[in-house]
Amino acid sequence: MLISFRTINKKISLFRLLFFSIATSFCSYAQEKNDENVDSLIDELFFNDQQFLDEMLEKNYIYNFIYTSLSYNSNTFFSGRDSGIDQFNIIPQISYYHSSGFNASISGIYYENFTPSWDFTSVSLGYFKTFGKSKNFMYNLGYTKYFYSDDFDYFTNSLDISLGIRNKKQTLGTTLAASYIFGTDESYQIVSNSFMNFTLSRTANFAMRFRPNISFVIANQTFGKYTIRIINGRRFFVYSGTEVFDLLNTQIGFPISFSRESWDLELGYYLNLPNPAADENNLSNTSFIGFSVGYLFDVSKKK
């Protein structure tokens, strides 16, 4: 098979979706109507399960709010792999959550050096619930539609399910999320994320926390290589692909978050440990700095 730009674009775009889905992933937990549990719920919603929104809720708060966020990453790596292009990325997101479990969000991603720079917009709908005696278990079901800036149509939909558990003190937790990504083609991914939670400082209207975390990305992916062949005296690049379902990347994060009233900030260092798959070899570790800012709009009716 001769070189096909769409074949190359397909692989790159799947990596981009894997990156995006991790960067905007979330989990939700307690839904009891008291301050402590509301705080716990919001504590888990956004920024890759690492953002903390504390000490901003009044009594009798109802789960009905809009959350806006803007994330900046100093460099871009797809499944931990260096694409050879140094570029930052920016991810804006607006999400809505209701106490019934319904949630919706719209998001997108901007790359510094891609053309077009605005890669795609995603619209997601979901439903989450907690279960278990202590409400320490949760599940979330969701659907996402992707709208690309170009004519890419390999992966335009995603069906997602996630399961989570954490201890009663909320100092340890883990989630497991699975996605079926499809369009004119299809792929699968599994993402596991585990965290520890340390409160460094806390007052009536301010909180600072450190939560190191580790995530594993397993996905179905076609890896290809190009070889030169001579046909009738002419040179051709011939593509051959190998499909694998394997661990693609391990990421370790060290974020510190600051929250005051309805505002929250997060600053973290992230290390990627990409795992060679198929014919890959000698993959270098990569790292970047992440920064995010968010604001919560309370649209609840107070008693």
Which residues make up each language-model segment?
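Residues that define the transmembrane beta-barrel architecture of outer-membrane proteins
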Residues: 64, 86-90, 117-123, 155-161, ...
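Outer-membrane beta-barrel translocator domains and adjoining extracellular loop/strand segments
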Residues: 78-85, 115-121, 150-158, 187-191, ...
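Outer-membrane beta-barrel "beta-signal"
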Residues: 39, 284-303
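Cleavable N-terminal export/targeting peptides
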Residues: 1-60, 299-303
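Short loop/turn motifs that connect adjacent beta-strands in outer-membrane beta-barrel proteins
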Residues: 57-64, 130-138, 168-173, 199-211, ...
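Residues on the lipid-exposed face of transmembrane beta-strands in outer-membrane beta-barrel proteins
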Residues: 70-72, 92-96, 125-129, 143, ...
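Outer-membrane beta-barrel transmembrane domain signature
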Residues: 179-284, 297-300
